[in-house]
């Protein structure tokens, strides 16, 4: 396991009891795979109240509905007001945070007072938290960047060079922003930590599971084998499926996302997908 040697601080305790973890809590953090979010949110609903707040740290989109994670939580945890359900996102490679390296993030809540409380709670000398009220933008930046990270892995795995990768990341950000704005986000959010910041970190680091997935596919391995080797959730796979359907419904052109979908689910070779992106109509 990636964090088996990480020591918890003495103030922390571990439990497998939902009631024990959440009973009387003011701020709950939920960080589970997106495909299990609805079930997990339903499980915790009876332990929270109108005075609770929920911080969602999952970066994904529900495939079946196309809904963001906070939307799913709001549907399942009715006791907590929607304005008190928000998201934490940013360039947060978990192993670096666990080892105490300097990191930053953005927390987004519609209720400003809750956002301030969460910001103050999470901030430390090595973890600086900024605040936003654009929950949609913060969530979508964190979710959609995983799609782009898979393609960044294609480029590095095929040794296509830094020029290609820089151009790809730039166009990827443009694509994320285009879909995000169509879904109700503010465009400037994607220039921040939960957009550009998260995108850069995830596209350049071997600590990124989605990046490693792309590298593995570019080496000729099939999807199931690479996912098995990762041994962890790669949110870019279900998010790609969801994003393709959302973009189709909104009539938004998403060439990078579509190319990634073709590799993941239709068997296209990664290098061929990159080539086809290069010869699209100008």
Indicate residue ranges for each PLM-predicted region.
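Short, small-residue-biased leader/transition segments that mark boundaries at the very start
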Residues: 1-7
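Alpha-helix C-terminal capping/helix-to-coil transition sites in glycosyltransferase folds
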Residues: 2, 23-24, 50, 144, ...
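Structural alpha-helical scaffold elements that stabilize or flank donor/cofactor-binding regions
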Residues: 6, 20-21, 193
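Short, conserved active-site loop motifs that form the nucleotide-linked donor/cofactor pocket
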Residues: 11-13, 52, 127
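Rossmann-like NAD(P)(H) cofactor-binding subdomain of soluble oxidoreductases
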Residues: 15-23, 27-102, 118
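Internal alpha-helical scaffold of NAD(P)-dependent oxidoreductase catalytic cores
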Residues: 36, 47, 72, 76-84, ...
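General beta-strand structural signal in soluble alpha/beta enzymes
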Residues: 56, 83-89, 129-133, 191-192, ...
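NAD(P)-dependent Rossmann-like dehydrogenase/reductase catalytic/cofactor-binding core
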Residues: 152-156, 181-191, 195-282
